[in-house]
Amino acid sequence: MAKYPVVVYGASGYTGMLTIDWLIDQNIPFTAVGRSAKRVEEMMKQRVVRLESATYEIVETEHTVEALTKVFQGAKVVCNTVGPFVQYGAIAAEAALKAGCHLLDTTGEQAYILDMRERFGESYRQAGLVLAPSTSYMYSFAEIAAELALETPGIDCLETATLCRGTRFAAAGVTVGSTASIFGMARVKQHYLWEKKLVEHPVTASFNVVDPNFMEPVFSLPWSGTSLPVFYQTDSRVRSCISSVGFYDNDVMKLAHGFFQKWEAEFKDLPAEHQDAIIKGAVDSTTPSMPPRERTTTVRTVDFAIGRGQLSAVRATVHGITAYISTGALQTAAVTKLLDGETNKVGFTSACKAFGHSYLLGFLEQRGLARATVQQL
């Protein structure tokens, strides 16, 4: 049973520890949960800032519904950072529901998000609990841009792009878990929203995104489809939403695109255990260990949304830094609202819809993590 109101599940992982950083910064007590208490303690001592001033406990548990339910009981909010979420997320979602906890996670995996909506959305709603996947840089920044665009009357069609800069000659500075999620995209369908229906992207889909922030177009991919088409499918303001992701100053997207096409041609019909081995090999070869903490001089982001109506058009842009550090900040911003019992929506929802895009943007702006601009077109 959790001693404190917030549980961070996956506390020895990169994103979990950055979430803990921000909880400590906001003086929020927490229960750090992982499969190995020893590893959680060791990693937190190495990586977590201001740990000496924190109020917390460390709990070891197995990754089962029964075990996690017992650990989550007593808490109000669970921050789940254990991925790939397609593989591990549903167990934590079921456990949080049984324990009577709100659930935030950091996924960007559209297939998982769709599964959460269908399997748990109504149950969380009836329980008065928030189920908010993708409470993270990907794709809350793009959704903030989309919401800013939707402030213009008449906008009903959205195109969004999430453009990131990381390590120039490496795997874009992503974590081991993120890399596993990326290669795992080859196994699932990717969708965009068209006339209120989710439509599958072709396997070969790619975009050359043009933005005035850059001299050259940025090669981008659907990247599982992102969470935005799912969130906006049930939003009466939006008829269509197409989203993409690109890494500028880095060729990683072209490598990923090649892998996805190779998967379609050679691997898609192999037995599951063979596919698992292929994905593990790809992850190990590109991201063998936890990356260092992000630097503001290296990790910079541009997320924008172009909104169009019959006669209106607008472009909203969110400039940001340090995507994973910003993810920890977004988790903590959401936790702060939930601990005070403040939410605009329960059940399956996005962070923007539950807590307000203006609140999230303000939280980021005041901590030097993002700024936004809006331009009428």
Where are the predicted features?
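N-terminal Rossmann NAD(P)H-binding glycine-rich loop of SDR-like oxidoreductase domains
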Residues: 6-26
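Conserved glycine-rich Rossmann-like NAD(P)H-binding loop of the short-chain dehydrogenase/reductase
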Residues: 28-39
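Residues at the starts of beta-strands that form the adenosine-phosphate
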Residues: 5, 29-30, 157
